[in-house]
Each structure stands twice: as structure tokens, then as C-alpha cells.
Amino acid sequence: VSTKGTVAFTTWDGELEAAVYVHNAGSFTPETFAEFFATVARDCGPVPHDLRFHHPSYLAAKFVVWCACTASMAFRGVGVITGPEGWHANRRFTVRCHQEASAVPPQVTEDER
């Protein structure tokens, strides 16, 4: 049985801008997001603006691609949604992006259920 999850990507002041559904989020940990941010940093280079850690929808799109590429057939269980409300999810994460370009990864929290 999979553990469904949602990941909300918000602006620095908490406004929802993009959301992702992950069918198998049971194995997600803070290290999962650290690995994702490290991949973005490695692949996008050292210029903070290019990392887009301040751009929720851009970062959400990269997260979908990263999820789809990290495990065999993982692309079958990840997708873009309008928001976490109304989705039956066992786990809900929020990625709060920065106000301005930064090389520091965004803050990730797991919402209490």
C-alpha cells in the first residue's frame, strides 16, 4: 500500500503557487528534499538566480521531473495538482521559497496531520 502525499510550493509569505501529488511519499524524509535541492544546484550551476529557489512554480516543475527520474516507473505516481486541499494524502509537505534569488535551499516542513 502506498503512502500518498502532496507537496505545496509557496512564496516566501506562504501563498500557494504550485502543488505536486506524489503517490508513494512514504519514503520521503528531509534528506529527500535535500537530495532534490542538491540536484538542482549541481545541474543549474552556481548562479543563485538560475537555481530558482525563489520561484515556486519553476521549482515545482523541476520537482516533478526529479521525482519521475529517481526511481523506475516513478513517473506513473507523480503529477501537478491545483492544491493539496481535497486530496486524500497521508503526508503533506510545504516548500517555502525565498523572496529573492538565493543559493540557500528553501525551507521544507511536513504539516501535522
What feature does the model see in each segment?
Residues 9, 27-31, 43:
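Catalytic phosphate/metal-binding cores of nucleic-acid and nucleotide-processing enzymes, i.e., regions
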Residues 34-36:
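A cross-kingdom marker of C-terminal helix-rich interaction/assembly modules
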Residues 39-113:
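Low-complexity intrinsically disordered segments
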